[in-house]
């Protein structure tokens, strides 16, 4: 990351995630993926670029579903996620599991449009 921004890489539980939403400085961006996921690898560079371009009031999280299984399994159960990769965005004040914005899949054109939209909202 060129910005020196630190990236959250794991949540011990879904409760730890909710705790983060409570102190959200502006936006929380969470990408769920896995080392073994081909589509996740396909968009890896684009996601890193997106994270590096996010302003300081955006907390970025790159979460491996195998390392934070409690949160991912809960998101699947609540139908917030149905596969990986998925990127979800929560706005300050939203302390629920339902994200304000999300992008599912590895289509680079669609992801680039999502990134443009999010960066304009983050300003």
Residue ranges and their predicted role:
Residues 1-28, 108-123:
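N-terminal leader/targeting and pre-domain segments
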Residues 8-13, 32, 44-72:
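Thiol-based oxidoreductase modules, predominantly thioredoxin-like and allied folds used
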Residues 17, 29-30, 47, 51, ...:
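Structural signal for hydrophobic/aromatic residues that build the beta-strand cores
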Residues 19-21, 72-79:
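Short amphipathic alpha-helix with an adjacent loop that forms part of the alpha/beta core around
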Residues 33-36, 83:
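Short pre-active-site segment immediately N-terminal to redox-active cysteine/selenocysteine motifs
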Residues 37-40, 87:
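The canonical Cys-X-X-Cys-His
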Residues 38-39, 68-71, 96, 109-112:
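Eukaryotic short linear interaction motifs
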Residues 82-83, 88-123:
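Non-catalytic, surface beta->alpha helical segment in thiol-disulfide oxidoreductase systems
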